[in-house]
Amino acid sequence: MKLFNPFYKKPINFHKKPINSRKEIPIAEVLNPLTTKQLVKENDHDQFYFRMLEQQGIVLNERQLEAVRQTEGPVLTLAGAGSGKTSVLTARVGYLINVKKVKPENILVLTFTRKAAEEIKERIAQLPGLSKNTVRNLVAGTFHSVFLQILKSQGYDYKILSNEKHKEVIIKRILKDMGLKDDYDPETILSLISYSKNQLLTIEDLPEQTPVEREFKDIFRRYEEWKNKEHYMDFDDMLVYTYDLLNENQRLLERLQERFKYIEVDEFQDTNIAQYRVLQMLAEKHKNLFVVGDDDQSIYAFRGASSDIILNFPKDYPNTHIVKLDVNYRSNPSIVGLGNEIIKYNQKRHVKTLRCYKRSNEYLTPFYMRPKDTADEAQLIVENMRSDVRQGTRKWKDFVVLYRTHAVSRAIVEQLVLKNIPFVVYGDKKPFYEHPIVKPVLDYIRLSINPNDLNALKSILPTMYLNRDKAIDYITTEMVFNPLDESETLLHYLLRMPGLHPSQKELIIERIRLLDDIKKMSPVDAIREIRQGKGQYEKYLEIDQRRSFTLQKEFANEMLDELVASAIPHKTHESYLNLIDKILKKHEEMEELKNDPYADVVSLMTIHNAKGLEFPCVYTSVDYPKLYIRLP
């Protein structure tokens, strides 16, 4: 399996060559671009600044130079991956101060992460002619941190509600008070509230045509009332409160507009409506708005980011100067070429093709895998890793597996556990088998083996349209005062519960029969019976309006399909559940390694969690039909 490619016309390296595959790998154009050393002449008025940059090892290419020099008016800088956007952002700040004689306090730099903000501040302070004292008055921070300072300047003294677990506890309490404890996922409710705020939608703006929509508005309203009562605000409130404040306080807005004559924004493709509206207000007077981003890297729509903002920027600002940073300094031509080949099929994008900076005559080529199913896929990846580690060319920490959703990681995790390979899953709060969609199905199987498993019973109660708390309280009381006969199970207690509708009793009887039936089946047949047969679990997910309100049908089907695939190799429930318990235990053990930067572990994460990170060896899923690519 040769991964080094010294030739441009190297055939594609396939694990299994698919029909009608192209013969050669897509290669990005390689060039050695002109730089400021050739482009900036000695008689140029700003040559002194670029000569100082060069002495510090900062050499800009033609497009980067264009972006730095274009200081007036709206500028859209389309920065492809690895094209040096941070160098441009920082060099441009230095240019404004050194060449244009702009005071640092008249410059605002906005980023999306604290780490990025700190890096930009540090780099600016190291620029020629500048120091930490010089840039002390420069405002550089995240949208939230800058907006928070604006709010504090006007007397806002709210406590910050930043802990996600704390917010979930609040929502759980609200749901319990409304008698909806088992009906909504708190995490999803919070995501919907956040999305609404990022779109600047108030509670009154939301629809209320169905009972579920009215319930959501009530949950939303109670959450806001709790925060106001306890004097809290969350991160989304910082955006909304700043937007409202600037709309209401014209004097403050004018003061900020006068101060921030030049505004720079990083990762502009991740901007949401609330952030953009505030940005437009701040830049309204001088319109010196410099935004850097890449619409091809817009992957946070589910959090409220809108790619339309970067796509329509030239329409919002008709005299926009567009600069395309199209030279990748990070990756080799075969990887950049692969990215170009895939992204060109996007319909909504600013047209651009990345080129490569020539650094060597030797190039690594992607290794393509075409597995037949998820199990084959996982085995191929894990064996590929083990081969490298055995040969001494890699360590476990060199590998990362990227995927679209955590459901896809199930088979990979299983193989890593079976082969005793250390791993850490980033970004997911629950393992696949503990997911709220998956767990009830498994608990039906657990109950078929042990009908008196109270923990398993808890998760299936909502599928019988029973209130979990009331049912468990009744059962635990009955277990003390009215023990069951030997032929009875916990489900028989439910038949005696007062206030049951005849249809509920019939459903409980059907579930007792179901448990008897699936006990004799293989795990995969049992799951199918629970999902689409007598268990009617899929129907339950569809007709439960509350669940369908917060759950995409495609996502639920993907999770359940993956669960079916996980059961295929097992002949007995015992072997299947033993493996699941082993995997869950391993997850707990591996969690302790998550915060250890020196741990030698394979990393697993979604593409969203991986943004901005680098690894020596990457496995990534393109999409169905399954195609895994190893990027060295």
Predicted regions and their residues:
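ATPase/helicase motor core of nucleic-acid motors
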Residues: 317, 360-365, 393-523
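N-terminal pre-P-loop "Q-motif" helix
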Residues: 56-72, 274
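Conserved RecA-like helicase ATPase core segment
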Residues: 44, 48-52, 273-371
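SF2 helicase catalytic motif II
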Residues: 258-273, 290
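Conserved helicase core region in the C-terminal RecA-like lobe
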Residues: 139-147, 264-267, 292, 405-407, ...
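Helicase P-loop NTPase motor core
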Residues: 77, 83-89, 93, 319-321, ...
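A basic/glycine-biased coupling hinge at the interface between accessory DNA-binding modules
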Residues: 3, 22-54, 73, 94-246, ...
